[in-house]
Curated annotation (Swiss-Prot):
One of its GO terms (biological process) is ubiquitin-dependent protein catabolic process via the multivesicular body sorting pathway. Its main location: cytoplasm. Pfam families: Snf7 (PF03357). GO terms for molecular function: identical protein binding; MIT domain binding. Residues 174-199 are annotated as: Interaction with SPAST. InterPro entries: Snf7_fam. Residues 183-199 are annotated as: Interaction with VPS4B. It comes from the Eukaryota. Residues 180-196 are annotated as: Interaction with VPS4A, MITD1 and STAMBP. This is Charged multivesicular body protein 1b. Keywords: Cell cycle, Cell division, Coiled coil, Cytoplasm, Endosome, Membrane, Protein transport, Transport. Probable peripherally associated component of the endosomal sorting required for transport complex III (ESCRT-III) which is involved in multivesicular bodies (MVBs) formation and sorting of endosomal cargo proteins into MVBs. MVBs contain intraluminal vesicles (ILVs) that are generated by invagination and scission from the limiting membrane of the endosome and mostly are delivered to lysosomes enabling degradation of membrane proteins, such as stimulated growth factor receptors, lysosomal enzymes and lipids. Probable peripherally associated component of the endosomal sorting required for transport complex III (ESCRT-III). ESCRT-III components are thought to multimerize to form a flat lattice on the perimeter membrane of the endosome. Several assembly forms of ESCRT-III may exist that interact and act sequentially. Interacts with CHMP1A. Interacts with VTA1; the interaction probably involves the open conformation of CHMP1B. Interacts with CHMP2A. Interacts with VPS4A; the interaction is direct. Interacts with VPS4B; the interaction is direct.
Length: 199
Protein backbone atom coordinates (compact mmCIF):
# COMPACT_ATOMS: atom_id res chain seq x y z
CA UNK A 1 0.00 0.00 0.00
CA UNK A 2 1.51 3.33 -1.08
CA UNK A 3 1.58 6.41 1.16
CA UNK A 4 -1.17 8.02 -0.91
CA UNK A 5 -3.36 4.93 -0.52
CA UNK A 6 -2.82 5.05 3.26
CA UNK A 7 -3.87 8.70 3.31
CA UNK A 8 -6.90 7.79 1.18
CA UNK A 9 -7.83 5.06 3.69
CA UNK A 10 -7.49 7.59 6.54
CA UNK A 11 -9.74 10.04 4.68
CA UNK A 12 -12.45 7.41 4.23
CA UNK A 13 -12.09 6.37 7.87
CA UNK A 14 -12.40 9.99 9.02
CA UNK A 15 -15.58 10.43 6.94
CA UNK A 16 -17.07 7.40 8.73
CA UNK A 17 -15.98 8.72 12.14
CA UNK A 18 -17.64 12.07 11.41
CA UNK A 19 -20.77 10.18 10.37
CA UNK A 20 -20.71 8.27 13.67
CA UNK A 21 -20.34 11.54 15.57
CA UNK A 22 -23.42 12.86 13.73
CA UNK A 23 -25.41 9.77 14.80
CA UNK A 24 -24.24 10.21 18.40
CA UNK A 25 -25.49 13.81 18.34
CA UNK A 26 -28.83 12.59 16.93
CA UNK A 27 -29.17 10.20 19.89
CA UNK A 28 -28.30 12.99 22.32
CA UNK A 29 -30.91 15.23 20.67
CA UNK A 30 -33.60 12.55 21.11
CA UNK A 31 -32.61 12.08 24.75
CA UNK A 32 -32.85 15.84 25.35
CA UNK A 33 -36.30 15.92 23.71
CA UNK A 34 -37.49 13.19 26.08
CA UNK A 35 -36.18 15.27 29.00
CA UNK A 36 -38.07 18.31 27.66
CA UNK A 37 -41.36 16.37 27.79
CA UNK A 38 -40.69 15.19 31.35
CA UNK A 39 -39.81 18.70 32.52
CA UNK A 40 -42.96 20.16 30.90
CA UNK A 41 -45.11 17.46 32.50
CA UNK A 42 -43.64 18.42 35.88
CA UNK A 43 -44.32 22.10 35.11
CA UNK A 44 -40.61 22.96 35.25
CA UNK A 45 -40.29 25.30 32.25
CA UNK A 46 -36.80 26.53 33.20
CA UNK A 47 -35.38 22.99 33.00
CA UNK A 48 -37.41 22.31 29.83
CA UNK A 49 -35.85 25.39 28.20
CA UNK A 50 -32.32 24.19 29.08
CA UNK A 51 -33.03 20.78 27.54
CA UNK A 52 -34.52 22.48 24.47
CA UNK A 53 -31.33 24.51 24.01
CA UNK A 54 -29.27 21.33 24.40
CA UNK A 55 -31.44 19.51 21.85
CA UNK A 56 -31.02 22.31 19.30
CA UNK A 57 -27.26 22.43 19.93
CA UNK A 58 -27.01 18.65 19.38
CA UNK A 59 -29.12 18.89 16.21
CA UNK A 60 -26.89 21.64 14.79
CA UNK A 61 -23.77 19.70 15.74
CA UNK A 62 -25.16 16.57 14.02
CA UNK A 63 -25.76 18.57 10.83
CA UNK A 64 -22.23 20.01 11.01
CA UNK A 65 -20.67 16.56 11.47
CA UNK A 66 -22.79 15.13 8.65
CA UNK A 67 -21.92 17.99 6.30
CA UNK A 68 -18.20 17.61 7.05
CA UNK A 69 -18.43 13.84 6.65
CA UNK A 70 -19.89 14.32 3.17
CA UNK A 71 -17.22 16.87 2.32
CA UNK A 72 -14.34 14.63 3.46
CA UNK A 73 -15.94 11.70 1.60
CA UNK A 74 -16.12 13.78 -1.60
CA UNK A 75 -12.46 14.78 -1.24
CA UNK A 76 -11.57 11.10 -0.73
CA UNK A 77 -13.33 10.30 -4.01
CA UNK A 78 -11.30 12.99 -5.74
CA UNK A 79 -8.05 11.69 -4.25
CA UNK A 80 -9.05 8.24 -5.55
CA UNK A 81 -9.48 9.72 -9.04
CA UNK A 82 -6.13 11.50 -8.82
CA UNK A 83 -4.37 8.33 -7.65
CA UNK A 84 -6.03 6.29 -10.41
CA UNK A 85 -4.98 8.81 -13.05
CA UNK A 86 -1.50 9.24 -11.57
CA UNK A 87 -2.11 12.99 -11.29
CA UNK A 88 -1.12 13.48 -7.65
CA UNK A 89 1.10 16.56 -7.47
CA UNK A 90 3.71 17.17 -4.75
CA UNK A 91 1.69 20.03 -3.25
CA UNK A 92 -1.45 17.88 -3.23
CA UNK A 93 0.44 15.01 -1.57
CA UNK A 94 1.66 17.47 1.10
CA UNK A 95 -1.88 18.62 1.88
CA UNK A 96 -3.13 15.02 2.06
CA UNK A 97 -0.26 14.14 4.42
CA UNK A 98 -1.18 16.99 6.79
CA UNK A 99 -4.78 15.74 6.78
CA UNK A 100 -3.99 12.69 8.88
CA UNK A 101 -3.08 14.69 11.99
CA UNK A 102 -5.92 17.19 11.50
CA UNK A 103 -8.59 14.52 10.98
CA UNK A 104 -7.59 12.78 14.21
CA UNK A 105 -8.41 15.94 16.19
CA UNK A 106 -12.03 15.91 14.89
CA UNK A 107 -11.88 19.73 15.07
CA UNK A 108 -14.46 20.86 12.49
CA UNK A 109 -12.86 24.30 11.96
CA UNK A 110 -9.41 22.84 11.27
CA UNK A 111 -10.85 20.13 9.01
CA UNK A 112 -12.88 22.74 7.11
CA UNK A 113 -9.80 24.94 6.58
CA UNK A 114 -7.85 21.93 5.33
CA UNK A 115 -10.69 20.94 2.98
CA UNK A 116 -10.63 24.50 1.54
CA UNK A 117 -6.90 24.18 0.92
CA UNK A 118 -7.31 20.74 -0.62
CA UNK A 119 -10.19 21.79 -2.88
CA UNK A 120 -7.98 24.64 -4.12
CA UNK A 121 -5.32 22.06 -5.06
CA UNK A 122 -7.93 20.24 -7.08
CA UNK A 123 -8.90 23.27 -9.16
CA UNK A 124 -5.85 22.62 -11.35
CA UNK A 125 -6.60 18.92 -11.52
CA UNK A 126 -10.21 19.68 -12.47
CA UNK A 127 -9.04 21.60 -15.53
CA UNK A 128 -6.81 18.68 -16.53
CA UNK A 129 -9.51 16.08 -15.99
CA UNK A 130 -12.43 18.03 -17.48
CA UNK A 131 -12.23 16.13 -20.75
CA UNK A 132 -12.25 12.80 -18.93
CA UNK A 133 -15.15 13.87 -16.71
CA UNK A 134 -17.15 14.86 -19.77
CA UNK A 135 -16.94 11.31 -21.11
CA UNK A 136 -17.70 9.53 -17.82
CA UNK A 137 -20.36 10.21 -15.22
CA UNK A 138 -18.83 12.65 -12.78
CA UNK A 139 -18.72 10.92 -9.41
CA UNK A 140 -16.04 13.19 -7.99
CA UNK A 141 -17.75 16.57 -7.97
CA UNK A 142 -18.33 18.10 -4.56
CA UNK A 143 -21.82 19.32 -5.39
CA UNK A 144 -24.77 17.08 -6.14
CA UNK A 145 -27.22 18.08 -8.90
CA UNK A 146 -30.24 19.60 -7.15
CA UNK A 147 -32.68 17.96 -9.55
CA UNK A 148 -31.42 14.49 -8.56
CA UNK A 149 -31.67 15.38 -4.88
CA UNK A 150 -35.28 16.59 -5.34
CA UNK A 151 -36.20 13.46 -7.28
CA UNK A 152 -34.73 11.19 -4.60
CA UNK A 153 -36.56 13.11 -1.87
CA UNK A 154 -39.83 12.74 -3.78
CA UNK A 155 -39.17 9.03 -4.36
CA UNK A 156 -38.53 8.43 -0.66
CA UNK A 157 -41.64 10.44 0.28
CA UNK A 158 -43.74 8.40 -2.18
CA UNK A 159 -42.43 5.15 -0.67
CA UNK A 160 -43.33 6.41 2.79
CA UNK A 161 -46.77 7.50 1.56
CA UNK A 162 -46.07 11.17 2.29
CA UNK A 163 -46.64 14.31 0.24
CA UNK A 164 -43.65 16.65 0.04
CA UNK A 165 -45.68 19.47 -1.55
CA UNK A 166 -42.74 20.15 -3.86
CA UNK A 167 -42.86 21.26 -7.46
CA UNK A 168 -40.42 18.94 -9.21
CA UNK A 169 -39.42 19.38 -12.85
CA UNK A 170 -41.05 16.58 -14.82
CA UNK A 171 -39.31 14.46 -17.39
CA UNK A 172 -35.72 15.20 -16.39
CA UNK A 173 -33.55 12.62 -18.09
CA UNK A 174 -29.89 12.19 -18.79
CA UNK A 175 -28.28 13.33 -22.03
CA UNK A 176 -27.51 9.72 -23.00
CA UNK A 177 -31.18 9.03 -23.66
CA UNK A 178 -34.28 7.85 -21.85
CA UNK A 179 -34.08 4.30 -20.58
CA UNK A 180 -37.08 2.00 -20.46
CA UNK A 181 -36.97 2.06 -16.65
CA UNK A 182 -37.19 5.84 -16.44
CA UNK A 183 -40.01 5.87 -19.01
CA UNK A 184 -41.91 3.37 -16.87
CA UNK A 185 -41.16 5.45 -13.78
CA UNK A 186 -42.57 8.57 -15.49
CA UNK A 187 -45.71 6.67 -16.47
CA UNK A 188 -46.13 5.39 -12.89
CA UNK A 189 -45.61 8.90 -11.53
CA UNK A 190 -48.28 10.29 -13.88
CA UNK A 191 -50.74 7.55 -12.90
CA UNK A 192 -50.02 8.21 -9.23
CA UNK A 193 -50.61 11.93 -9.77
CA UNK A 194 -53.96 11.21 -11.48
CA UNK A 195 -55.00 8.96 -8.58
CA UNK A 196 -54.14 11.72 -6.11
CA UNK A 197 -56.22 14.20 -8.09
CA UNK A 198 -59.24 11.87 -7.93
CA UNK A 199 -59.04 11.46 -4.13
Amino acid sequence: MSNMEKHLFNLKFAAKELGRSAKKCDKEEKAEKAKIKKAIQKGNMEVARIHAENAIRQKNQAVNFLRMSARVDAVAARVQTAVTMGKVTKSMAGVVKSMDATLKTMNLEKISALMDKFEHQFETLDVQTQQMEDTMSSTTTLTTPQGQVDMLLQEMADEAGLDLNMELPQGQTGSVGTSVASAEQDELSQRLARLRDQV
